[in-house]
Structures are given as structure tokens and as C-alpha cells.
């Protein structure tokens, strides 16, 4: 059983989305909107301690001990607080099915690995679609993934090595997150794009996402408060 952190992380809550319209978000970073439980992961590698807290401050660490261990193993820093979601959406079969039937030629190997993992991505051809002889294997993979595990999908970096990042612009926090947190079966980083995002939005819609998150590239992090530089919108139908 992984020990939880000594300091009380309950005072820190995730930043909430505001009510601003999408068109009013300046220079947006666009992400798929994740279904799942919003959490902050408090990680201390030196002490081998982690705490995963939801937006109410409840401790979910023991319920998700494998994810806590995976987060500590993935962190290339002494400590961090990472904003993310506990979700099966990154690993479940509905997204996998969308990948193997996608007609979007630009689907990358990284995107395939994000949703299916290394084994699942081996089913796909170089352009993100299986060859004709792979369709049976893809169906077997879909069935295998019906009971997909919950993973942690990181969306933001709140603190790094004891230094709060509240005043650092979002895009820079994203870059720090990419450097600080590796990926694996139970730890992912959300994909994000800048405008124009039409092709990526089509891809995310085909994966089964129901909405999009728009976040100003220069936005700061307001823990526990709503920030109008962040907004959610339903997935466009076309």
C-alpha cells in the first residue's frame, strides 16, 4: 500500500471552468473534454508518497493505488502537483473502435498509443488504420478492452519541485508537464492543439468525446475558483 503525503492537500482544489463563450477565449488551447473524476495528484518521489484528491478534497489514493505508483514512477522531478482526470476514456474500447475505423489519414502513432497503448497501436497501419488482414485482430482487441482500466489523464501542472505555477501561463505549464511527466498504460497526458483545430476536432469526435475544453494560452491557474479564461462547449456535430 502506498503511503499518503504528510502535508494536508485538502486546501488545494482544481481550478473550475468559467462561463465565457468559446469565441471570447483569447488564443485558445483546445483539448477534448474528459469524462471522469477531476483530481489533483500530489506526488513526492523522494518520500515515495502520493495523494490523489478529488475536487471535494476526498482522498482516493487507496482506491487507485496502481495509478499512484505509476504516477510516482512517471515523474521526472522530486515533487509535483498534477491536475487531471481519473477516467477509462483513454483506454476503453469505444475510443479504440473509433481508431480502427477512422478515415482520417493524419492520425498519428502517438495518438494511437495514447488511446490503445503500445499493444493496441500495433494493430494499426502506418496511417492509423488496420490493414485488411488485421480486422479480425482489431475485433479481438476491442473485446479485450471492453473492461478497460481507469487511467490518470494529466491536463495541467500546478506545482513543480515545491514551486507553485499559478502565475505561469498555461502553455508554459503544458510544456513543463510534458518534460516532467512521462506516459504509460495508467498515466497519460491530454492531447491539445491550437487553432486551426478542425481536423483534430473531427478525430476527437470520432473517438466518442462529447465536448471540448477551450483554455486561453496565457491563462493563469486559480485553484478552487472559476476562471473565465477556461470554458467547456459541446462537441460540434460537423
What would you call each of these model-derived segments?
Residues 1-238:
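Catalytic cores of nucleic-acid ligases and guanylyltransferases
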Amino acid at each position: 500500500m502506498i503511503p499518503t503525503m504528510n502535508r494536508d492537500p485538502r486546501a488545494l482544489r482544481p481550478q473550475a471552468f468559467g462561463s465565457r463563450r468559446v469565441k471570447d477565449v483569447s488564443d485558445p488551447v483546445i483539448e477534448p473534454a474528459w469524462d471522469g473524476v477531476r483530481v489533483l495528484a500530489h506526488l513526492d518521489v523522494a518520500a515515495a508518497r502520493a495523494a490523489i484528491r478529488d475536487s471535494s478534497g476526498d482522498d482516493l489514493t487507496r482506491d487507485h493505488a496502481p495509478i499512484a505508483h505509476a504516477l510516482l514512477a512517471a515523474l521526472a522531478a522530486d515533487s509535483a502537483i498534477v491536475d487531471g482526470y481519473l477516467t477509462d476514456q483513454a483506454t476503453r474500447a469505444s475510443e479504440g473502435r473509433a481508431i480502427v475505423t477512422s478515415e482520417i489519414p493524419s492520425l498519428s502513432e502517438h495518438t494511437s498509443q495514447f488511446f490503445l497503448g503500445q499493444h493496441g497501436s500495433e494493430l494499426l497501419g502506418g496511417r492509423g488504420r488496420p490493414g485488411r488482414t488485421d480486422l479480425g485482430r482489431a475485433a479481438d482487441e476491442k473485446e479485450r478492452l471492453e473492461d478497460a482500466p481507469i487511467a490518470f489523464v494529466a491536463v495541467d501542472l500546478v506545482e513543480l519541485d515545491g514551486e507553485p505555477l499559478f502565475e505561469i501561463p498555461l502553455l508554459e505549464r503544458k510544456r513543463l508537464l510534458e518534460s516532467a511527466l512521462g506516459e504509460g498504460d495508467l498515466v497519460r497526458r491530454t492531447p491539445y492543439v491550437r487553432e486551426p483545430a478542425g481536423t483534430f476536432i473531427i478525430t476527437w469526435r470520432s473517438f466518442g468525446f462529447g465536448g471540448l475544453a477551450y483554455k486561453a494560452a496565457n491563462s493563469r491557474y486559480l485553484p478552487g475558483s472559476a476562471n473565465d479564461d477556461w470554458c467547456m462547449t459541446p462537441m460540434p456535430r460537423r
